[in-house]
Design a protein with these regions (language model features):
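Conserved glycine-rich Rossmann-like NAD(P)H-binding loop of the short-chain dehydrogenase/reductase
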Residues: 33-49
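Amphipathic alpha-helical dimer-interface segment in Rossmann-like NAD(P)H-dependent oxidoreductases
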Residues: 119-141
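Conserved glycine-rich cofactor-binding loop
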Residues: 19-21
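The beta1-alpha1 cofactor-binding region of Rossmann-like NAD(H)/NADP(H)-dependent oxidoreductases
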Residues: 44, 66-78, 110
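Rossmann-fold scaffold of SDR-type NAD(P)-dependent oxidoreductases
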Residues: 16, 89-97, 120, 150
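Conserved mid-core segment of classical short-chain dehydrogenase/reductases
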Residues: 76, 99-114, 137-143
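Catalytic loop of short-chain dehydrogenase/reductase
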Residues: 140-161
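Catalytic Tyr-X3-Lys loop
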Residues: 106-126, 149
Length: 161
């Protein structure tokens, strides 16, 4: 039964970085609307805690996966697991991010810059692209395609120190 504006019953939502922060908040919203949720994040313990919270909030089904979105193949494999476990995908919330460990670009090693971009930029791109491919296949088969949501940083609009 819908609890608010949306009814997510029977809908599968993938939330990257969904075991805490904004990602968990988004997943909780879907859970309260009765949706099924897949979480990709790197910390298995935090994934398990998030799963318990989401089920308590009313999610239909929750599966968590240890997926590092900085690698394209991990994302492709992760979608294969979601397809195997749920059989469909209705929404992708690309939320994984990495916090800069340095206050100044002058102090940031190039290696850290590449690690940061592998998650924040490349990971979001791979996640959205591969999710869109699955949704396109469904749309071509006559079903509704789905929704893609990219979560960005306020630093897009105002530089951070």
């Amino acid at each position: 039964m819908a609890k608010g504006l949306f009814d997510c019953t029977g809908k599968v939502t993938l939330v990257t970085g969904g075991n805490g922060g904004i990602g968990l908040g988004f997943a909780m919203g879907c859970a309260r609307m009765g949706g099924d949720i897949a979480i990709w994040a790197r910390n298995a313990e935090k994934n398990a805690a998030a799963k318990a919270q989401l089920l308590e909030a009313g999610a239909g089904r929750v599966e968590t996966y240890v997926v590092d979105v900085s690698t394209e193949q991990a994302i492709i494999d992760g979608y294969g697991q979601i397809q195997q476990d749920f059989g469909r995908l209705d929404c992708v919330f690309a939320n994984s991010g990495a916090s800069p460990r340095f206050n100044s670009v002058f102090d940031m090693p190039t290696e850290h810059w590449h690690e940061f971009q592998a998650v924040a930029l490349h990971g979001a791109f791979y996640t959205l692209r591969e999710g869109a491919r699955l949704m396109k296949e469904r749309a071509e088969a006559g079903e509704r395609g789905g929704s893609l949501v990219a979560c960005g940083s306020l630093s897009l609009f105002q530089g951070l120190p």
